[in-house]
């Protein structure tokens, strides 16, 4: 019987490969994106200290609409919170997901609202 590869295992494998090459610092944190079936989460992470500097998700009260609209709003929120915490330059970590759909909407919204990557 032919077995179909598990999409999430392949995603985690891609994410581990990329994470070996990129790392966030206090000066330039990593913008990490996690996407589930229903929600999307974004965090600014300082990997050196191992702390989250700012975060936003579709669970936040001001986020509503379709999944793509939620991703756009989360991108706007993470950019606003990141700039308020004093971060403008970040390293984008798509988390092994394709740069398409909700991940792309979040990234473009974050760029439009002032984050540089």
UniProtKB/Swiss-Prot annotation:
It comes from the Bacteria. One of its GO terms (biological process) is translation. GO terms for molecular function: 5S rRNA binding; structural constituent of ribosome. SUPFAM superfamilies: Translational machinery components (SSF53137). Keywords: Ribonucleoprotein, Ribosomal protein, RNA-binding, rRNA-binding. It holds the Pfam family Ribosomal_L18p. Part of the 50S ribosomal subunit; part of the 5S rRNA/L5/L18/L25 subcomplex. Contacts the 5S and 23S rRNAs. Belongs to the universal ribosomal protein uL18 family. This is one of the proteins that bind and probably mediate the attachment of the 5S RNA into the large ribosomal subunit, where it forms part of the central protuberance. This is Large ribosomal subunit protein uL18. The gene is rplR.
